[in-house]
Amino acid sequence: MNRHERLLEELKAYVAADAAEETHRRAMVGLLASTDAFSRAHFMPGHFTASCYIVDGQGRLLLHHHRRLDRWLQMGGHVERDETPSLAALREVAEESGLADLHFPGGAGAETGIFDLDIHAIPAGKGEPDHHHFDVRYVARTRTPDAIAIDRAESNELAWVSLDRAAELMPGPESHRVIRKIRERSPF
């Protein structure tokens, strides 16, 4: 099964937490059916990305202050050629935070399931027009939270924060939905 087929199967089986997330799920299914949805050069309506919320043993989240967007976010980025979204999410976290000790909850395998879905606007920059990221989101745990190392090309700062502080730093409803899910499904 190729990554398009695998993601399509996962999206069709995914149960959204609310109406907004269901709208995102349906749009993602449509994008997969109609385009080269993983291509970074596909701007209308956008392309798939992957991100990951990292939780430590104290229930804190690792956030980074994104250099270009000037916002606190989870780590993530583009899905490379022949890479699944879940593996892309782990790769991006490792590149942006230095953390290699990352585990999806519930098992050692990399394909353990989507945690959240979001579609968000990306402003023009780096020679790219305004477009949307169709973000497939995961949650993973680390046992080595002190091993973080900032990538200054991507981040102004890395910080382990409580879920309450994360909700303050990331005030959007999509972030609050993820934080609510993390609270409901803990411990990780």
Predicted regions and their residues:
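Generic N-terminal amphipathic, Lys/Arg-enriched alpha-helix
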Residues: 4-15
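Acidic, metal-coordinating catalytic segment for phosphate/diphosphate chemistry
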Residues: 13-51
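Short connector loops at helix/strand junctions that flank enzyme active sites
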Residues: 45-49, 67-69, 74, 131-135
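Residues embedded in well-ordered beta-strands
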Residues: 51-53, 60, 137-139
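Glycine-rich active-site/cofactor-binding loop and its immediate structural neighborhood
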Residues: 55-57, 61-91
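Unchanged
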Residues: 80-174
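Charged phosphate-binding loop/patch that engages nucleotide di/tri-phosphates or the phosphate backbone
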Residues: 170-188
